[in-house]
């Protein structure tokens, strides 16, 4: 009989994601694919051509509804609007909002965030081909990391107690 699962928080690391400014989009798309980095900062309001295209789609029948999606390369927004691709338009809007959280410095841009400590190495492997990297930072004393829960078998915490009898 399978055991029930207990969820415990995963240890989180404060990180900076650094990418060449020319490759910022590719870096953010890869971060979205990985799905394990929570960028920090106040997201700016949506703006731009993608927002207007999505608003115009509001009165028409949409296709591909659901979660936002991204393409590797910048899409033709007019074509997405004609095709009713609201998921891709929504994804572009979110990508642009997160891109504006970046802190540019010369030819690089950096984003601050949190990720599970176990994901730092795998993220660096994913970002290396894009000339990007994840750097662990010491969190400020006042910062409290977000909580990400991970399931663990319930009997593991009690195993020493049971084995002692």
Located regions from the model:
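Long, charged N-terminal accessory/stalk domains
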Residues: 1-165
């Amino acid at each position: 009989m399978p055991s029930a699962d207990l969820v415990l928080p995963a240890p989180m690391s404060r990180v900076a994601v650094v990418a060449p400014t020319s490759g910022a989009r590719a870096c953010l798309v890869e971060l979205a694919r990985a799905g394990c980095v929570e960028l920090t900062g106040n997201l700016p309001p949506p703006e731009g051509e993608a927002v207007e295209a999505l608003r115009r789609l509001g009165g028409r029948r949409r296709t591909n509804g659901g979660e936002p999606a991204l393409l590797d390369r910048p899409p033709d927004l007019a074509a997405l609007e004609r095709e009713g691709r609201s998921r891709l338009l929504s994804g572009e809007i979110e990508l642009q909002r997160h891109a504006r959280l970046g802190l540019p410095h010369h030819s690089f841009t950096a984003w601050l965030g949190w990720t599970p400590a176990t994901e730092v190495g795998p993220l660096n492997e994913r970002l290396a081909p894009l000339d990007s990297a994840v750097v662990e930072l010491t969190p400020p004393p006042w910062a409290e990391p977000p909580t990400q829960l991970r399931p663990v078998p319930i009997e593991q915490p009690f195993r020493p107690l049971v084995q002692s009898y």
